[in-house]
Amino acid sequence: MDQQYSNELTPEIVAELEMSPFTAEEIAAMDQDSRAIIAEEKALEWKHPVNAIWRIATEGNITRCGGIVAPVERESKLLLDNGRYASIATAGDIVTCPEGSTATIATSAGATSMCNGADVALVDSLLDNGDEIISTPQRHTYLVTREGITSGADFLTVTGA
């Protein structure tokens, strides 16, 4: 079985998120307008620190009750640590439960994150049987929420409810 990752916001992830993608030399070489944009973004990040991460779900995710998100062939895939690619899971995808029944992913990132018109599922997405996705085999791709900034109205909300 592939390594699994949760939505735990670790000190390592916080440090990674706080790291600038630009070196001091790159910033110094930028024009004043570009440096101003970077400074504004940094101020926003300090005012509204990350308070949660939401990993993107893929085939192979595990649910609280031991279900596994079934493989679906999609163009949109994420690279796993083992070098394999896994299709991104979306609302409506099937989860195979340990006793042989199936359930459907019922909640997603909503309009915050879509994949070819379908709502992307997340770790913490609920299933139509009350189960919940708790981990994913991919560690690199996630959404963040920030203190004081609300998520979209359809974020992790059952659609049609």
Where are these regions (language model features)?
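Intrinsically disordered, low-complexity proline/glycine-rich segments
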Residues: M1-A161
